[in-house]
Amino acid sequence: MQVLIIGSGGREHALAWKVAQNPQVDTIYVAPGNAGTALEHKVQNVNIGITDIPALVAFAQDKAIELTIVGPEAPLVIGVVDAFRAAGLPIFGPTQGAAQLEGSKAFTKDFLARHNIPTAAYANFTEIEPALAYVREKGAPIVVKADGLAAGKGVIVAMTLQEAEDAIQDMLAGNAFGSAGSRVVVEEFLDGEEASFIVMVDGENVLPMATSQDHKRVGDADTGPNTGGMGAYSPAPVVTQDVHDRVMREVIDPTVRGMAAEGNTYTGFLYAGLMIDSTGAPKVIEYNCRFGDPETQPIMMRLQSDLVELCQAAIAGKLDQVESKWDPRASIGVVLAAGGYPGDYAKGEVISGLPTQESAGQKVFHAGTETQGDQVVTNGGRVLCATALGNTVLEAQQRAYQLADQIHWNGMFCRRDIGYRAIAREQAK
């Protein structure tokens, strides 16, 4: 069996690594992939960009690809799933219409309101003056979001009115995020603990994946600007069984039903970014129409079921006939980033200390890497994700940092506290 994975990040490396464990799979093509996927057993990189949909379709037809899994959001929002389905090619992901849940924050907030799904109070703006008037009326802290895709960086949590006004000016007048910021969503600041709740959806049935928690801020103790994610762990202890049941009942099920009722039947991975308050009540912060990055890395370390079988069941509309099995241990992924990220950073730095053989329960997933000759060099802001399993979150953290500390390049940095909330919970018991 031949499988195609679209993307080049740590998420796609983790998906490829997992798919390779299926004995029926002969070759996994990753378009365009990275240095890590190139070195993986059964995996080949293909030099096709993630938004070159005609080339992706032609390649899948040429290689008789039996399953395509889409990693990032950009190809989904421009209709890669629609194009593959039109060509009769099996693909797991949402259609262009369904991917609006991530592609437009204003669409999402209006959808949540229509279906009484809990979320922060908000308003949408395309003009500066009404937006400024709204934040002055509401006061800080307040959240300002670019409407479109901004690689996870289009969200400003403004702790002062000045920060909120600057963000609105930047997005609506300064064009800080291009067309993604030509409309902004301003919403109330939510208190609580965040969790990533990822499920597989076949249009009707839902199969929950393991819970996780992402660390968005660049600095220790959640300081500094937002990033695409500096690390993650699974499971997220904030999601107790009660919270899990509430999320399914109050958020996931009405979302899947609502999308179907509106003619945008949802298939694919659905990721709800949630804020859980002190009473265990969830509110939706955002939806992503794909697996999170870096959450995929620790989640795939824990997944014991066959990912190919789960995706095929979903494509066939039979998710109610399968179940997912999980390693009971905790897993942590620590992102190793290029100096300057999430701002400007250098590329082409030579990476040393990468592990030469696999050790059980530890894995370095590649993201912004490429090979030059026999060297692996940096090629992005988030470069690697050192991931490990442990009997406790603390043990998983220690093993992940043990792996991370062997690796070096000029300017490398990482957060030193990934998993701190879960570790504090463990130690309080």
From Swiss-Prot:
Binding-site list for Mg(2+): E286, N288
Domain ATP-grasp: 109-316
Binding-site positions, ATP: 135-196
Keyword Ligase: yes
Gene Ontology MF annotations: ATP binding; metal ion binding; phosphoribosylamine-glycine ligase activity
Gene3D superfamilies to which the protein is assigned, alphabetical: 3.40.50.20, ATP-grasp fold, A domain, ATP-grasp fold, B domain, Phosphoribosylglycinamide synthetase, C-terminal domain
SUPFAM superfamilies: Glutathione synthetase ATP-binding domain-like (SSF56059), PreATP-grasp domain (SSF52440), Rudiment single hybrid motif (SSF51246)
Pfam family, one: GARS_A
Cofactor(s) recorded in Swiss-Prot or TrEMBL: Mg(2+); Mn(2+)
EC numbers: 6.3.4.13
Entry superkingdom: Bacteria
Presence of the UniProt keyword Heme in the record: no
Catalysed reactions listed for this entry: 5-phospho-beta-D-ribosylamine + glycine + ATP = N(1)-(5-phospho-beta-D-ribosyl)glycinamide + ADP + phosphate + H(+)
Enzyme class: ligase
Associated pathway: Purine metabolism; IMP biosynthesis via de novo pathway; N(1)-(5-phospho-D-ribosyl)glycinamide from 5-phospho-alpha-D-ribose 1-diphosphate: step 2/2
InterPro entries referenced in this protein's UniProt entry, alphabetically: ATP-grasp, ATP_grasp_subdomain_1, PreATP-grasp_dom_sf, PRibGlycinamid_synth_ATP-grasp, PRibGlycinamide_synth, PRibGlycinamide_synth_C-dom, PRibGlycinamide_synth_C_sf, PRibGlycinamide_synth_CS
PROSITE patterns with a match to the protein in the record: ATP_GRASP (PS50975), GARS (PS00184)
Cofactor note: Binds 1 Mg(2+) or Mn(2+) ion per subunit.
GO annotation (BP), single: purine nucleobase biosynthetic process
Keywords: ATP-binding, Ligase, Magnesium, Manganese, Metal-binding, Nucleotide-binding, Purine biosynthesis
UniProt xrefs under NCBIfam families: purD (TIGR00877)
The family this protein is said to belong to: Belongs to the GARS family.
Protein known as: Phosphoribosylamine--glycine ligase
